[in-house]
């Protein structure tokens, strides 16, 4: 038999969670990319520490859901058919950004793109491949994707700042992997701020608040 693998692009319903600015106009926008097996609403709740009335927060949810430890989680991609999955979520995030910018006044806002855990790789790829620019690329608790187009990343970072944030006792990512990522970034002449904290595989809320919410 002549078996063939083909692809078909189809419409898909995507879910996201949003926290609107109480003041009606946002001076800071956050695109928050969750980690493996998380859901958008749960991830957005991690940012309740952002009390600023003029911050608009949006957490998109990965397009693939699955059962995980008797709960439901979402994922951004797997190794299987990875290029199409990357293309799908870049297109999805482009459409989400288009919708948000049409519906809310973000003309003078600061744009923050934050990725946590698996969401770091998604955030980096969207930062490079996406149609929108961000003032800050904030990468929390993950190694850095080795297949990055560093030429394009350097070009994008001319108008942005990148933060590489990691715990010294991360139970998911070893210090060796963090150090390999830092070395990779330096070798490719990437300007970034390396920030470590005493802690596990978590979002350091105090650190994020001090950096971006004061």
Each language-model region and where it sits:
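Short alpha-helix in the alpha/beta-hydrolase fold that links the catalytic acid
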Residues: 43-46, 150, 174-184
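Gly/Ala-rich beta-loop-alpha elbow adjacent to hydrolase catalytic centers
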Residues: 114-119, 123
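Serine-hydrolase catalytic machinery in alpha/beta-hydrolase-like enzymes
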Residues: 8-106
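C-terminal catalytic histidine-bearing segment of alpha/beta-hydrolase fold enzymes
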Residues: 163, 176-214
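Alpha/beta-hydrolase fold nucleophile elbow
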Residues: 105-115
């Amino acid at each position: 038999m002549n078996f063939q693998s083909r692809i078909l692009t189809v419409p898909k319903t995507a879910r996201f969670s949003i926290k609107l600015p109480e003041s009606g106009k946002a001076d800071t926008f956050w695109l928050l990319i969750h980690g493996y097996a998380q859901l958008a609403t749960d991830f957005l709740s991690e940012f309740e520490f952002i009390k600023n009335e003029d911050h608009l927060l949006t957490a998109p949810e990965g397009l693939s859901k699955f059962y995980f430890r008797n709960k439901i989680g979402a994922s951004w991609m797997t190794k299987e058919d990875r290029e199409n999955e990357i293309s799908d979520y870049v297109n999805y995030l482009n459409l989400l950004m288009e919708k948000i910018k049409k519906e809310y006044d973000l003309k003078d806002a600061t744009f923050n793109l934050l990725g946590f855990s698996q969401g770091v790789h998604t955030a980096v790829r969207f930062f490079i491949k996406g149609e929108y620019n961000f003032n800050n690329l904030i990468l929390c608790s993950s190694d850095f994707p080795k297949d990055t187009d560093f030429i394009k990343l350097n070009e994008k970072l001319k108008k942005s700042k990148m933060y590489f944030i990691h715990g010294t006792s991360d139970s998911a990512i070893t210090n060796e992997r963090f150090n390999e990522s830092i070395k990779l970034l330096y070798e490719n002449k990437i300007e970034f701020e390396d920030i470590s904290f005493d802690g596990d595989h978590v979002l350091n809320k105090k650190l994020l608040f001090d950096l971006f919410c004061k």
